[in-house]
Design a protein with these regions (language model features):
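Conserved blade-ending motifs and adjacent loop-strand segments that build the rim/top face
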Residues: 90-112
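A generic structural signal for well-ordered alpha-helical surface patches
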Residues: 79-82, 103-106, 115
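Blade-level signature of beta-propeller repeat domains, shared across WD40, Kelch, NHL, RCC1
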Residues: 107-134
């Protein structure tokens, strides 16, 4: 358990509820696991997808994180795909990259038979394709 809604490095954003229930910044002090990665301010995560090694031989313990967000927020990591690679124990990020899309990404779907990732884009609406090329 990572602590939500008791502990978070983010901020509450929903009115009266935030006055009645404190949001603690420490996780460990309240019996929760400290997060490995924190996005503050929020990048508006919409999907987290494990990307298999077949996608790329170097992709061991890799995840794509899609984000929503608003126009003009690319610099804050919104409307992008965040690529994270974890160590063997999944307790440390050993690689991180951001792929700007400049569109709200509602969903990511890995299609094994075609070895590609579909992006379901919200605002346009459209479907994007993420495929590795040599």
């Amino acid at each position: 358990n990572y602590g939500w809604p008791i502990s978070s490095y983010g901020e509450r954003g929903y009115g009266e509820f935030s006055k009645d229930v404190p949001l603690h910044k420490s996780h460990k002090d309240y019996g929760f696991v400290e997060p490995i990665k924190v996005y503050s301010p929020s990048i508006a995560i919409s999907e987290i997808t494990k990307i298999p090694k077949i996608f790329n031989e170097n992709f061991t313990n890799n995840f794509f994180i899609s984000t929503l967000g608003w126009e003009g927020q690319l610099a804050n990591g919104q409307q992008s795909i965040h690529h994270l690679r974890f160590n063997e124990n999944f307790d440390q990020i050993i690689f991180e990259d951001v792929i700007p899309i400049d569109e709200r990404i509602r969903d990511l779907i890995y299609i094994k038979e075609m070895n590609l990732v579909l992006l379901v884009l919200e605002t346009i609406p459209a479907i994007g394709i993420l495929r590795l090329t040599n």
